[in-house]
Swiss-Prot record:
Annotated source species: Osphranter robustus
Pfam families recorded: ATP-synt_A (PF00119)
Keyword DNA damage annotated: no
Protein name: ATP synthase F(0) complex subunit a
Functional note: Subunit a, of the mitochondrial membrane ATP synthase complex (F(1)F(0) ATP synthase or Complex V) that produces ATP from ADP in the presence of a proton gradient across the membrane which is generated by electron transport complexes of the respiratory chain. ATP synthase complex consist of a soluble F(1) head domain - the catalytic core - and a membrane F(1) domain - the membrane proton channel. These two domains are linked by a central stalk rotating inside the F(1) region and a stationary peripheral stalk.
PANTHER family (UniProt xref): ATP SYNTHASE SUBUNIT A (PTHR11410:SF0)
Molecular function, one GO term: proton-transporting ATP synthase activity, rotational mechanism
GO CC annotation: mitochondrial inner membrane; proton-transporting ATP synthase complex
């Protein structure tokens, strides 16, 4: 049992060398390219999920926004794979690190904003000042809209970090309680084990949902600037 509750969120190392890059590249092994004319069931499921997500996210985009299809699909598959990887025993979830999530959010957000200022600068600047704003409120609204714009990538990263971290903490706490109650009451420990099992199933759904939410928000930022 870990002495520190947050020890599971410390970046693992081997001989002082971080293993985070290896963990981040591991999901690529799960998405192999087909070697036969007839794909297996896993590959059929992958293609079906990619087509479904692509249809839902890219319907609102124009031709320029749809050029991001490969980026968005790679993003959602990467985040979902790393989230699910962290649910395995003795594993590590890279998305619990705020630095990594900010490193993903800021470049994507900045790319959409720069694309908006390059393609339609007047419309992008108009977002800072809604139409019909009273003159005394103009400076205040510009400051508020500017702050809200720069908060977007931070909120994107914090949302993913908080949801994944909270779920792992709950699993850790309930798992520790289950082990402690085994020597006290078998009935109570069985109930807590059932709760732990149901919570693990919920975390599987949360891992997929958070990957979808992160990618969907990036897609909405892209839609606003394309």
């Amino acid at each position: 049992m870990n002495e520190n509750l947050f020890a599971t969120f410390i970046t693992p190392t081997i001989l002082g060398i971080t293993t985070l890059p290896i963990i981040m590249l591991f999901p690529c092994l799960l998405l192999t390219s087909p070697k036969r004319w007839l794909p297996n069931r896993i590959q059929i499921l992958q293609v079906w999920l990619i087509r479904l997500i692509t249809k839902q996210m890219l319907t609102i985009h124009n031709k320029q926004g749809r050029s991001w299809a490969l980026m968005l699909m790679s993003l959602i598959l990467f985040i979902a794979s790393t989230n699910l990887l962290g649910l395995l025993p003795y594993s590590f979830t890279p998305t619990t690190q705020l630095s990594m999530n900010i490193g993903m959010a800021i470049p994507l957000w900045l790319a959409t904003v720069l694309m908006g200022f390059r393609n339609k600068p007047k419309i992008s600047l108009a977002h800072f000042l809604p139409q019909g704003t009273p003159t005394p409120l103009v400076p205040m609204l510009i400051i508020i809209e500017t702050i809200s714009l720069f908060i977007q990538p931070v909120a994107l990263a914090v949302r993913l970090t908080a949801n994944i971290t909270a779920g792992h903490l709950l699993i850790h706490l309930i798992g520790s309680a289950t082990l402690a109650l085994c020597s006290i009451s078998v009935t109570v420990s069985t109930i807590t084990f059932i709760i732990l099992f149901l919570l693990t199933i919920l975390e599987l759904a949360v891992a997929m949902i958070q990957a979808y939410v992160f990618t969907l928000l990036v897609s909405l930022y892209l839609h606003d600037n394309s």
